């Protein structure tokens, strides 16, 4: 079947979403056009509003509608702890554990094959955040994947000898898993059982 230019454009736009292939994008596009035009318009408005109104927190770099996200704006949080995560969904996951420290959000993990080196994921900004803060412990909560482990190792080597306690989230998080998919109890156990990196 040959689609009109506007429908093809909609299908291709939907394909940028993770896990959405050609067939799924076609089904979504046709469902919106045939059965739920008002829902499609709401989706378009919400997407436009979010793209225009959501930026990054100037301190931790998570997604935020304000200059400071709620976690960075909260004066009751523990300024001695800094939790380093790969993305904004990881902040949400760690928050579910009751963690009360500060965050730094990388832009993913080191992946030389994809052209993602230290600068691309924000390592210089992390160094500046640590230099300007009063942190005594840095918790490396990157995903327990090969790339996440490599990123944690790189950061640990970079921060060694700076008088900081460096720890890595521990057991409870499955190897090869993603933090955003781990339940809160498991992640709380992993944070409580974190271990120093030597």
From Swiss-Prot:
SUPFAM superfamilies named among the record's database cross-references: Recombination protein RecR (SSF111304)
**Sorted alphabetically, which keywords does the UniProt record give?**
DNA damage, DNA recombination, DNA repair, Metal-binding, Zinc, Zinc-finger
Gene Ontology molecular-function annotations: DNA binding; zinc ion binding
| Gene Ontology terms: biological process | double-strand break repair; recombinational repair
Q: Which organism is it from?
A: Pseudomonas aeruginosa (strain ATCC 15692 / DSM 22644 / CIP 104116 / JCM 14847 / LMG 12228 / 1C / PRS 101 / PAO1)
Under the heading Pfam families, the entry gives: RecR_C (PF21175), RecR_HhH (PF21176), RecR_ZnF (PF02132), Toprim_4 (PF13662)
Zn finger regions (C4-type) covering which residues? 57-72
What protein name applies here? Recombination protein RecR
Coiled-coil annotated spans: none
